[in-house]
Every structure is written in structure tokens, then in C-alpha cells.
Regions:
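Catalytic/RNA-binding core of pseudouridine synthases
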Residues: 1-150
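Conserved small/polar residues in nucleotide/adenosyl-binding loops
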Residues: 154-161
Length: 166
């Protein structure tokens, strides 16, 4: 048995988020289905970070376990030919069996874009927030200063369930 790490990029517009939900299509569900069909056995990915509905990701990390003889580095190619165009595997590689993406020391970067013009641009509507009124950039910079640095958001997470434990 080997553990394969996937670096996943996706446009979350058409998804209810990362994690499988009973009321909508999730990125994790699409990956599970794609892997299961490709490998011929039920396969589930474990993700590093959950995203909400409509949120995009450039490098979310996920792992799955497999007995497949195919080299781990080839999974990105195999999956990308089967995945919808709004989900892509940027990289795949073998990692130690005890590697868990949620418990690795990682840096998460969140990017929010404000499109400040007289009229919205329809090509930017899915990736920016349109704001018509003038922005006070000086106050925005001052406020942003409070966000700089290492911050622990553990107090914001939901209580752990048995699924959260390894």
C-alpha cells in the first residue's frame, strides 16, 4: 500500500465546497468518484483544507491510499484526462504512509480581490467583488496592518469528530 499526495487546483463556482455534502456536489466527491472509477476500487481522498461553496483553490493538498502499481507521479496525468475542466491535479507524488495533509506545517494564503470601477466587468464576476463606491485606500492599508503576522484560527474551527482524528 502506498500513499499518494495530490496538489489540487479548482474553480469552486459549481461546487458546494471541498467536503462531501448531502445537498450538493463537492470537489472531494468528484475526486473520489474519478479515482474509484480509474482504480476499480472504492477510493477516498483526505484533504488538507476545506473550502466553502464557490471558493477556489490553487494548491489544496489531498492524499489517498492505493495498491496500484502505477508510479505516484503518473496519477496527475491519468486523473486530469478524466476530471472536469474546473478541477486539475497540479502534481502527484508518493509520501510516507503516515503523512496527513491536515497536520503538516503549511501556510495558507487567502486572496480577496475588489474590482472598483463604475461598471462591473462580466469576465471578472466570478473572481472579484465589485464595489462601485470610492475606496479609502489609506484606511484599508491601515486596517490590513492588523492582519499581518502568524495567526492561529483554531478557535474558529468546529469541534473535532472521530473523522477528524487519525
Amino acid at each position: 500500500m502506498k500513499r499518494v499526495k495530490l496538489t489540487v487546483a479548482y474553480d469552486g463556482t459549481n461546487y458546494c465546497g471541498w467536503q462531501v455534502q448531502p445537498n450538493g456536489l463537492a470537489v472531494q466527491e468528484v475526486l473520489n468518484r474519478c479515482l474509484s472509477e480509474f482504480l476499480g476500487t472504492e477510493t477516498e481522498v483526505i484533504g488538507a483544507s476545506r473550502t466553502d461553496a464557490g471558493v477556489h483553490a490553487l494548491g489544496n493538498v489531498a492524499v489517498f491510499d492505493t495498491d496500484a502499481r502505477m508510479p505516484a507521479e503518473k496519477f496527475s496525468y491519468a486523473l486530469n484526462t478524466r476530471l472536469p475542466q474546473d478541477i486539475r491535479i497540479q502534481d502527484s507524488c508518493q509520501v510516507p504512509e503516515d503523512f496527513h495533509p491536515r497536520f503538516q506545517e503549511t501556510i495558507k494564503t487567502y486572496e480577496y480581490k475588489i474590482y472598483n470601477r463604475q461598471f462591473p466587468d462580466p469576465t471578472k464576476r466570478l473572481y472579484t467583488y465589485f464595489y462601485y463606491y470610492p475606496l479609502d485606500v489609506q484606511k484599508m492599508r491601515q486596517g490590513a496592518g492588523y492582519l499581518i503576522g502568524a495567526v492561529s484560527y483554531t478557535h474558529l474551527r468546529a469541534h473535532e469528530t472521530s473523522q477528524d482524528l487519525v
